[in-house]
Each structure stands twice: as structure tokens, then as C-alpha cells.
């Protein structure tokens, strides 16, 4: 049996193909999928989906760093509502920092980074109050993510770095803090030997696998829908 710790089912729901996707997952011995929230655009959808597909799925809610804008505080105020539902989220995420595509204008870039950091800190505080694990999105921002988590005194035992893309050095830092890591299909890409080395250095009891569906299909289906 398999457990997909991180996927995004919205695209399949939008094109009315979700029933087929879940059926194929079940046929492939995928016991359960966690569909991960990224913004207001999918939180309510996922809460509704688990009402129908609760045996096969759980969900999370969180504000992805790429969707953090000037109104992020208002959006985060609605997060608590989901923990009042009959089927509450199993984690808060995905949250974190993404410095991969910042504005070229220095002032705008600094503003985006500041928004992301403040939203990240706030969501860690919310997760701490709710006693929930967090799913971390970190792209070109590993050092900054670790620093903010450390400064927040958040329980590292409840931290999952999703789609891990760093090296053995960073894995050892997470191991030392008792955090978790999750690997995707990019592990199979030829250029990612550093990831395979990192996998070998991961504490087995802290290792998770994910599809990040519909993204990041492994070899030989790289570039296609996952």
C-alpha cells in the first residue's frame, strides 16, 4: 500500500476527472492522498472533496508563498474556520518562502520577501495554537525557512519539508532538528544525484514520499501530467 503525502486535486476536480483519478490511484494501491491547499481558491473545494472522498483523501489549508499578496492577513483570518468543520484539515500548508521568481525591481522584490516572511511567521503561530503539523514550501530559501522556524520555537517534529531539493548537508540539519522530508519524482532526474545522496542520508523513520500531482512526473514521464 502507498500513501501520497502531497498532491493537488483541484485541476482534476475542475475538469470533472477526479472520480477517475481516485479510482486509478486505488487500483495502484494508493491507500490515501493528502490534497494540499495553497490559497482561498482551493481551501473550500478540498474541505468539500473530503466529505465525498473521505476514505481516500485528507486535506490541508495554507497560504502558499507565491500567493501571498497585500491582503494576506485577511485571508489567514479565515483559516481557523476549517478546524471547526466535521472534517478538519490534517495539517497547515503549504506555507513557507519562494525566492525563485521575485520581481526584478529591487524594491518590489524586498516587499514580496517581507510579505512572505510575515505570512510564514503568522501561519507558524496559527499552527502552534492549533497543534497542527506544517508542510513547508522552500524554493531558493532553505536557510531563511530554517531560521524562521527556529526563531518561532515551532516543534520541528511537526515540520515537513515537501519536494525536498537540497543536498545532504541540509538533510543532516533537518535530521538534527527531528524534522521530516518528502521526496518527489525529481529524485529520478539524471542531474539530481545530490538528491539521491540526500535520500540515502535521510533518517528512514523521517522519510516521506509524494507525487506533488499533477506536477513533477518521474522519469520516463518527465514533463507530462503526473
For each of these PLM feature ranges, what is it?
Residues 1-226:
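Mid-domain alpha/beta scaffold segments of enzyme catalytic cores
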Amino acid at each position: 500500500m502507498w500513501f501520497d503525502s502531497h498532491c493537488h486535486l483541484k485541476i482534476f476536480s475542475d475538469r470533472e476527472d477526479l472520480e477517475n483519478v481516485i479510482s486509478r490511484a486505488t487500483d495502484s494501491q494508493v491507500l490515501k492522498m493528502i490534497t494540499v491547499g495553497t490559497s482561498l481558491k482551493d481551501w473550500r473545494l478540498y474541505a468539500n472533496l473530503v466529505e465525498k472522498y473521505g476514505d481516500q483523501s485528507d486535506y490541508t489549508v495554507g497560504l502558499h508563498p507565491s500567493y501571498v499578496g497585500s491582503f494576506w492577513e485577511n485571508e489567514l483570518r479565515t483559516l481557523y474556520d476549517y478546524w471547526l468543520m466535521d472534517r478538519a484539515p490534517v495539517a497547515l500548508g503549504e506555507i513557507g518562502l519562494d525566492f525563485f521568481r521575485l520581481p526584478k525591481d529591487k524594491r518590489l522584490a524586498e516587499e514580496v520577501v517581507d510579505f512572505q516572511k510575515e505570512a510564514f511567521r503568522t501561519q507558524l503561530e496559527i499552527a502552534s495554537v492549533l497543534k497542527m503539523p506544517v508542510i513547508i514550501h522552500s524554493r531558493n530559501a532553505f536557510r531563511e525557512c530554517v531560521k524562521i522556524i527556529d526563531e518561532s520555537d515551532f516543534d520541528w517534529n511537526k515540520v515537513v519539508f515537501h519536494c525536498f531539493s537540497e543536498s545532504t548537508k541540509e538533510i543532516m540539519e533537518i535530521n538534527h532538528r527531528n524534522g521530516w522530508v518528502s521526496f518527489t519524482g525529481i529524485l529520478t532526474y539524471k542531474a539530481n544525484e545530490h538528491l539521491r545522496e540526500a535520500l540515502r542520508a535521510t533518517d528512514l523513520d523521517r522519510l516521506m514520499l509524494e507525487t506533488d500531482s499533477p506536477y513533477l512526473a518521474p522519469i520516463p514521464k518527465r514533463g507530462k501530467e503526473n
